[in-house]
């Protein structure tokens, strides 16, 4: 996906990119490739692949969830900033908090935000399980996002404790998500959530399946969740 195709694909979904936004995406790509030589941020470094598999893929969440109606977003395990920083570029009003367990990625994100002139962003080094217990973060966000971090049974325990009651958890998943969602039904209920919708689509060009899963946070998450760091992955809620 070259830049023109990127512009057209977003236009088809009702989003018109400004010159400022286009230059932010260009600089994002340049810094991603530059920093990737020093640290392992991504296996995808070809310009057209980055625009498709990182930028467009991240923004696809906005085709199925209205980010104009929310203010605070927490992105769990964002790595090099996906999906929340492309969403921040598209929706500058968002206040974005990223939690990532690797400190070197936080260093990159701080430099990136500076270079792109992004305000209203905060990057924290640590585990989602720790932040879910912290009163400053627990049930404080309108939306919690995650892309390709873990299976839904695990991901729900990372993310739902951070979403406020009445808020949402938006997961960006690859193919065959229906089995995951069936397995996660009880975990979502235990943690105070319920699946609202799963939107399936094909990534343009390569036509690989993607899914945007939207979960409503209906009730407070019981105090014992999330469990201590490492437990959700080892012993998923079923």
Curated annotation (Swiss-Prot):
GO terms for molecular function: rRNA (guanine-N7-)-methyltransferase activity. It is an enzyme of class 2 (transferase). Keywords: Cytoplasm, Methyltransferase, rRNA processing, S-adenosyl-L-methionine, Transferase. It holds the Pfam family GidB. Signal peptide: none annotated. InterPro entries: rRNA_ssu_MeTfrase_G, SAM-dependent_MTases_sf. S-adenosyl-L-methionine binds at residues 77, 82, 128-129, 147. It is found in: Cytoplasm. The keyword Cytoplasm applies. Its EC number is 2.1.1.-. GO terms for cellular component: cytosol. Specifically methylates the N7 position of guanine in position 535 of 16S rRNA. Belongs to the methyltransferase superfamily. RNA methyltransferase RsmG family. This is Ribosomal RNA small subunit methyltransferase G. It comes from Exiguobacterium sp. (strain ATCC BAA-1283 / AT1b). The gene is rsmG.
């Amino acid at each position: 996906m070259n830049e023109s195709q990127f512009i057209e694909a977003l236009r088809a979904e009702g989003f018109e990119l400004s010159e400022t936004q286009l230059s932010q995406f260009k600089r994002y790509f340049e810094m991603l490739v530059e920093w990737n030589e020093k640290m392992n941020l991504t296996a995808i470094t070809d310009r057209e692949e980055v625009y498709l598999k990182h930028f467009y893929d991240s923004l696809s969440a906005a085709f199925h969830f209205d980010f104009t109606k929310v203010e605070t977003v927490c992105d769990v395990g964002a790595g090099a900033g996906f999906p929340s920083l492309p969403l921040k570029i598209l929706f500058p009003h968002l206040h974005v908090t990223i939690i990532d367990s690797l400190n070197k990625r936080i260093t990159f994100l701080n430099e990136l935000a500076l270079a792109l002139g992004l305000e209203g962003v905060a990057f924290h080094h640590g585990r989602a399980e720790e932040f879910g217990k912290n009163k400053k973060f627990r049930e404080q966000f309108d939306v919690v996002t995650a892309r390709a971090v873990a299976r839904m049974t695990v991901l729900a325990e990372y993310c739902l404790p951070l979403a406020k009651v009445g808020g949402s958890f938006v997961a960006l998943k690859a193919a065959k998500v229906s089995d995951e969602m069936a397995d996660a039904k009880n975990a979502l209920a235990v943690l105070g959530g319920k699946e609202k919708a799963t939107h399936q689509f094909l990534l343009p060009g390569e036509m690989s399946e993607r899914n945007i899963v939207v979960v409503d946070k209906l009730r407070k998450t019981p105090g014992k969740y999330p469990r201590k760091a490492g437990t959700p992955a080892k012993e998923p809620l079923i």
